[in-house]
């Protein structure tokens, strides 16, 4: 029996005979109602009313004889007035809630969600502010804008002897004063800058010319800072350092080195040398590319003048 789904409750002993076929049931219904009772176009008081479509009984089978949606009842599309059908319009109230929502203006959306444009000038300025230096096996960022006034603290003084034996000039007079509100931040970035620059300047052996003149106590780096610099220097750089020349050594720096001598290796202590004027420095180092600040030259003239006065009196 096609098109009929039998359920368990139907298979009962109360049904002594088999259920009738679907075709006989449909024929009985048509005989009772008659074809004139089928829905069609009606006229009331001579006025044509809209035709109402009766929903057919939908069967879950695909058999055309069951009155499913595939039956011939819906094939009579020619008798239906499509213009007269009451269909929902495009502006139906079903979606009116969307229109009631406040719609922000395009400019407002752009203003709230937009990101400030990064101009080429700002990108260039940001690139100048931050610079990467490699110290040992790690890369460190240095705030170049913060240390801009103090970058002259380290410079390249040319070469000496044969080969690429570099002369590195360290001018303490360009150090920041300890009274600066951001002194620790400055010294931290300056430390990275000095060590990173030293890595770039040195290829083989090198010497450091430490210009100590014209330096107040406020600009003197602490012992911990100097020790940190020495400890952070790569082993290759510590080994290749041939000489540390201190020009115009003050009583403070000489006392400091004397106190720390027991904690410094004997090899490093042998590399330290004091020079009391620029003329003596010129005998040890080629001065062609060594940049001497004006304040150092002025201090040197004052010190040499005081030393020459007793000789002139004699």
UniProtKB/Swiss-Prot annotation:
Which superkingdom is the protein from? Eukaryota
Q: Where in the cell is it found?
A: Cytoplasm; Cytoplasm, Perinuclear region
Which residues does the record list as Phosphoserine (modified residue)? 41, 77, 89, 92, 114
Gene Ontology process terms (BP): apoptotic process; blastocyst development; centrosome cycle; negative regulation of apoptotic process; positive regulation of MAPK cascade; positive regulation of neuron differentiation; positive regulation of small GTPase mediated signal transduction; response to oxygen-glucose deprivation
Recorded hits in Gene3D superfamilies, A to Z, give: CRAL-TRIO lipid binding domain
Stretches for region Disordered: 1-21, 76-100
> InterPro entries from the entry?
Bcl2-/adenovirus-E1B, CRAL-TRIO_dom, CRAL-TRIO_dom_sf
Keywords, sorted A to Z: Apoptosis, Cytoplasm, Phosphoprotein
According to the entry, every stretch annotated as the CRAL-TRIO domain falls at 147-304
One function term, GO molecular function aspect: calcium ion binding
Would the keyword Nucleotide-binding be found if you checked this record's keyword annotation? no
Q: What does this protein do?
A: Implicated in the suppression of cell death. Interacts with the BCL-2 and adenovirus E1B 19 kDa proteins.
Provide the protein name: BCL2/adenovirus E1B 19 kDa protein-interacting protein 2
Name the species this protein comes from.
Answer: Homo sapiens
Give the lineage.
Eukaryota, Metazoa, Chordata, Craniata, Vertebrata
């Amino acid at each position: 029996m096609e098109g009929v789904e039998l359920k368990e409750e139907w298979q009962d002993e109360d049904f002594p005979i088999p259920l009738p076929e679907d075709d006989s049931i449909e024929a009985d219904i048509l005989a009772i109602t008659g074809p004139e009772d089928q829905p069609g176009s009606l006229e009331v008081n001579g006025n044509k009313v809209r035709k109402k479509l009766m929903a057919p009984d939908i069967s879950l089978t695909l058999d055309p004889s069951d009155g499913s949606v595939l039956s011939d009842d819906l094939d009579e599309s020619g008798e239906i007035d499509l213009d007269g059908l009451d269909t929902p319009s495009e502006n139906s109230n079903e979606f009116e809630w969307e229109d009631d929502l406040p719609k922000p203006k395009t400019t407002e959306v752009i203003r709230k969600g937009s990101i400030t444009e990064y101009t080429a000038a700002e990108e260039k300025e940001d690139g100048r502010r931050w610079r990467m230096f490699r110290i040992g096996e790690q890369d460190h960022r240095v705030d170049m804008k913060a240390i801009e006034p103090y970058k002259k603290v380290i410079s390249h003084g040319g070469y000496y002897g044969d080969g690429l034996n570099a002369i590195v000039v360290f001018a303490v007079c360009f150090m920041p004063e300890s009274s600066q509100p951001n002194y620790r931040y400055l010294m931290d970035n300056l430390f990275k800058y000095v060590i990173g620059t030293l890595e770039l300047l040195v290829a083989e052996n090198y010497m450091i010319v430490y210009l100590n003149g014209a330096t107040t106590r406020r600009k003197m780096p602490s012992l911990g800072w100097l020790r940190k610099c020495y400890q952070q220097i790569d082993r290759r750089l510590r080994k290749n350092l041939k000489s540390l020349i201190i020009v115009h050594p003050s009583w403070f720096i000489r006392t400091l080195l004397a106190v720390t001598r027991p904690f410094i290796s004997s090899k490093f202590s042998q590399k330290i040398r004091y020079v009391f004027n620029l003329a003596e420095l010129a005998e040890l180092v080629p001065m062609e590319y060594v940049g001497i600040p004006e304040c150092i030259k002025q201090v040197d003239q004052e010190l040499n003048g005081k030393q020459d006065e007793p000789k002139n009196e004699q």
